[in-house]
């Protein structure tokens, strides 16, 4: 089977489950090739986050903008380290499902972050262990997160904002994260995890890894 045939087989398998999308994509100036490329990026991003240890089991979610009006979003309740083509859905930028499986319960948060940061092409939500452990250690003093006498910390701490503790998947959480994202590309959600935005998938993941690395250092100093 040629590469072109393999890609066509993947597309047909996805459409057999969720319906044909060629005309739908064309309505937004996209084609099936860009859709498949997006799926590959989403799967790769989740796999890399899983390998980095910032996504475990079924937690976290990722979205990738396709053109100006659409995005791919990880589906609800999937193991991010072992994603398949059918584990991502196609949605409008307002968070409404166009085709595919049920959207992540955190989709509203992604919508809010894209509104806050129009340049973003990817939004990544993870549960990094060191950041979460550090937040427990600093209970009531989250303003001190990553506050260390290091050049690296001085560079990255201003890029981290704090959002309040709201139920996962709630509109209150989405609104809080969206407001915080206006100030910084990384938002720590109290008692929950981290949300990062980037102009690419690599940037969103890189910011996540940077914040987790600094949190690990600070934990050793406490």
PLM feature segments, named:
Residues 1-222:
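Glycine-rich flexible loops
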């Amino acid at each position: 089977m040629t590469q072109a045939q393999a890609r066509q087989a993947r597309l047909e398998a996805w459409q057999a489950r969720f319906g044909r999308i060629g005309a739908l994509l064309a309505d937004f100036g996209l084609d099936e090739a860009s859709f498949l490329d997006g799926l590959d990026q989403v799967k790769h991003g989740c796999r890399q986050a899983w390998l980095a240890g910032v996504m475990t089991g079924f937690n976290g979610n990722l979205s990738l903008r396709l053109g100006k009006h659409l995005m791919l979003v990880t589906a609800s309740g999937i193991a991010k380290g072992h994603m398949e083509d059918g584990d991502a859905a196609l949605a409008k930028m307002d968070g409404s499902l166009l085709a595919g499986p049920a959207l992540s319960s955190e989709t509203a948060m992604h919508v809010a972050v894209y509104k806050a940061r129009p340049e973003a092409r990817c939004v990544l939500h993870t549960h990094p262990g060191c950041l979460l452990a550090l937040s427990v250690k600093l209970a009531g003093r989250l303003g001190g997160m990553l506050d260390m006498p290091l050049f690296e910390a001085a560079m990255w701490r201003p890029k981290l904002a704090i959002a309040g503790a709201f139920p996962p998947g709630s509109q209150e959480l989405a609104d809080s994260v969206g407001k915080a994202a206006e100030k910084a590309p990384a938002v720590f959600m109290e008692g929950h995890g981290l949300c990062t935005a980037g102009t690419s998938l690599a940037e969103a993941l890189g910011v996540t890894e940077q914040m987790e690395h600094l949190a690990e250092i600070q934990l050793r100093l406490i």
